[in-house]
Amino acid sequence: MIDPDGYRPNVGIVLMRRDGQVFWGRRVRRDGWQFPQGGMHSDETPVEAMYRELNEEIGLLPEHVQLVGATPGWLRYRLPSQAVRCNRSQMCIGQKQVWFLLQLIGDESHVQLDQSENPEFDHWRWVSFWYPIEHVVMFKRGVYARALCQLASLAQQVVGLEVGTMPQYVQDICLLNVGYKHLPNWVSRY
């Protein structure tokens, strides 16, 4: 399913522990690490797709998490030219994503990376809230920065402490990838 602009609808998942650390998974047979994410089926809402992807990629069920919130709209990123692909005469140039913030309320022993025939991850760990922005593959850094910036106030409310000061590189990525000349007020709070 690709929209008329060439973007594939997708959901991204930021799974957070009670201490504010977030799930970070290493992709199978690759060096890259990322958050869980996946495409939506044509008959799914973003929330339904998120719960399906949560189970397929990391083995968690709805009762293992609390849905804290989501980005208010679609966040887009373009694929590098070598990754652009056609699907039945439609060209997919990137992904548009709704990002969800979930709090793990179950035991982390419920995390199982082998829930599907084609696992997405082969290893995982907990990292600080802002860490993924600098360590995800380059073409996703902008969308990660926008997603985490939009979810940071929700994360802070849930864990009851600062998710940490937004590092300068995150501010730079926001400026470069969103086109701001100055950081908006909602960014300067962090």
From Swiss-Prot:
Domain of life: Bacteria
EC numbers, comma separated: 3.6.1.-
Domain named Nudix hydrolase: residues: 6-149
UniProt keyword Membrane, yes or no: no
Co-factor(s): a divalent metal cation
Keywords: Hydrolase
Name of this chain's protein: RNA pyrophosphohydrolase
Organism annotation: Xylella fastidiosa (strain M12)
